[in-house]
Amino acid sequence: MRSSRQRGDRSAATGGGCGARRWALPRCGALCLLLALGCLRTATDGAKAKCEESQFQCSNGRCIPLLWKCDGDEDCSDGSDESACVKKTCAESDFVCNSGQCVPNRWQCDGDPDCEDGSDESAELCHMRTCRVNEISCGPQSTQCIPVSWKCDGEKDCDSGEDEENCGNVTCSAAEFTCSSGQCISKSFVCNGQDDCSDGSDELECAPPTCGVHEFQCKSSTCIPISWVCDDDADCSDHSDESLEQCGRQPAPPVKCSTSEVQCGSGECIHKKWRCDGDPDCKDGSDEINCPSRTCRPDQFRCEDGNCIHGSRQCNGVRDCLDGTDEANCNNVIQCSGPGKFKCRSGECIDINKVCNHHGDCKDWSDEPLKECNINECLVNNGGCSHICRDLVIGYECDCPAGFELVDRRTCGDIDECQNPGICSQICINLKGGYKCECSRGYQMDLATGVCKAVGKEPCLIFTNRRDIRKIGLERKEYIQLVEQLRNTVALDADIAEQKLYWADFSQKAIFSASIDTRDKVGTHTRILDNIHSPAGIAVDWIYKNIYWTDSSAKTISVASLNGKKRKVLFLSELREPASIAVDPLSGFMYWSDWGEPAKIEKAGMNGFDRQQLVTTEIQWPNGIALDLVKSRLYWLDSKLHMLSSVDLNGQDRRLVLKSHMFLPHPLALTIFEDRVFWIDGENEAVYGANKFTGAELVTLVNNLNDAQDIIVYHELVQPSGRNWCEENMVNGGCSYLCLPAPQINEHSPKYTCTCPAGYFLQEDGLRCGGFNISSVVSEVAARGAAGAWAVLPILLLVTAALAGYFMWRNWQHKNMKSMNFDNPVYLKTTEEDLTIDIGRHSGSVGHTYPAISVVSTDDDML
């Protein structure tokens, strides 16, 4: 409920220059009496001529928005806004309330009264309700139905909790170990030196570890394949497999850092400006060793990150500290609000009982206006207020009922509650004086919490753990190992409809795939892509069946078919440290983070066009990004600022979800599902979860991880189905190489475009690839590195030989052809131009390059 205090100008409230004041009749005879009566008449007559064109004037003089007339709700206290209205007829898809109000049919018996008289939730109507297939009743005394999958899932969804009764104990499978807490974990986690049960019960009564014949035992007791020893890639957490003692040589030197970076003692590179900034960024904290003292002067403010700023910058409304601590807990406004306080015009704050007491308590005597004390302005035209007029000792204030707010100090307008983030779990419908929450297809509202929960199989988290890939259920918390004996998994995604996992291995410089069945059995690993310098992030296009990845060493973003047979570098410029990547094939856009200098989050079409920057300010180390397709938002983690933030998919409406040095010391990857956000933190070696709107309800799901890097939610609703336009009318859209979704910028945008491999260009039909451009091949080779160069070298040799043969043949032909020489310079010029054009049409080594991608299919073509 909001109000507006009116003071001083009474003519605005009452419609006349005399106002509604109490007049003392002076000794001036009949003339003064006539003037007083004239003013009183003006005040009374003016009450009927106050409404604007966009308002409706009630019979009692009140003004209400014109849209409220004949809407079935009496807004004028005399009912005049609902008189002489044509009777409204409800649609067939509506439920007719007893009062005649219309509400959507789907709202009846949903546990939330939508009719003003509550008739859509009446016991007579709802007690006959029959639960649908795959639903169960919450009991004979309840009209509530919930999905079968919510039964015994650890959360009380029925009002009285009947769905969590008589559940019995969870029985672990033969391949699992039962923790003391009742949690089920993989037997391979038992006695592995890590507390996977979270209560330590999986590490009790463990015999000294022994490794197999073909294994090497690290000093930390971990076993690794013997072939991994002394291969210049540390697989033991203590690096004992690459030690001088084991290998007889010094470990391979760490990668060289650029001039704008410094090298950590643990080998990685960080920005030079992060050295000695008070915040450890290296894994071993070496960037904060041997740093000068960071003591601020007495006239300075010390930021939480250790930086010093001038004291005058604290609480000046500008974030001068990188972490914003100079603007925290600021309160520059003198509080003088509430019904018991009065703000003097001279600035003082006094008690309301001192107003109009014939004593000047304000310096300027503004608490004792002789002509305004004890005048009830609400008696005339309700003070000009559309709803509530509240008389005050001096002046009056307009107020609104719940669900409304003042739009012009007098008129109440509907509050659009849907503008508040998180007010609804998914869909928010703004109503007059309120709002209604609904869920997207595939979700159902939990009436106990208001959260839209997924219907169907239990959602789970799948995450990398360097040498294996693990899964934990979000309801029953079953914790198992999916893929084992990996080298160094750094990125992960899935094609959920096809039940396939995809991961990138940093050590093997490759991307792999494997099928996963309903029993969590993983099939044979298939290497689909090779020659990737430093894979940082991968994203699967589940509709068009392609895979996108970032390469932090080659500074590229590429795409390939899921079988790896066709690949293409989409971006190889203006990338510094490309990291996480996400795709939305429904709209044809992809998103990625880049923590280079300057750090940013970018967006582009999945075909490599329409590149744009989304986030460029207050961002330093954006590691993980994730899309919330239900709410159309992008979330990201900043490992330097220790923040979890979000923006809409156009880079607007930025919100800070969580800032925490405790839970976000070095976050790496995140994923979104329902109302929750889940992330991996590398420093804490844990998986956390929190509310995606508020950052509250923090929980720890997994502890004691080993260099975990990426995480996804595995559930069919994460990847909504859509049309593959590349297979709509022609195989592969008629493209001779890759068919890629185009960004849906407007209704005229193409649905897809074709693209060609390095060295080739699209012909005029926009479908076939032709020609050969050696410069683009060189760029592709540079992007792939030495291994890629060897793969492309035979092609270059063949092309070179073909070109040499062609020029030898053409030279022989010229020598054996009779020629005529004309001295006419005009003719000579013309024939030379014609010759150049002819060669350009038939030669494969032309200098002209056609556009890489051409429009193929649009909505208009489908009509």
Swiss-Prot record:
Q: Any idea what this protein is called?
A: Very low-density lipoprotein receptor
Q: Which residues cross the membrane?
A: 786-809
- GO MF entries: apolipoprotein binding; calcium ion binding; lipoprotein particle receptor activity
Could you list which ranges are Extracellular topological domains?
Answer: 44-785
Among PANTHER family, the record links this protein to: LOW-DENSITY LIPOPROTEIN RECEPTOR-RELATED (PTHR22722:SF15), LOW-DENSITY LIPOPROTEIN RECEPTOR-RELATED PROTEIN 2-RELATED (PTHR22722)
* UniProt entry keywords in alphabetical sequence: Cholesterol metabolism, Coated pit, Disulfide bond, EGF-like domain, Endocytosis, Glycoprotein, Lipid metabolism, Lipid transport, Membrane, Receptor, Repeat, Signal, Steroid metabolism, Sterol metabolism, Transmembrane, Transmembrane helix, Transport, VLDL
Source organism of the structure: Gallus gallus
Provide Cytoplasmic-side residue ranges.
810-863
Q: Which Gene3D superfamilies match?
A: Laminin, Low-density Lipoprotein Receptor, TolB, C-terminal domain
Q: Where does the LDL-receptor class A domain lie?
A: 49-87, 88-128, 129-169, 170-208, 209-249, 255-293, 294-332, 334-373
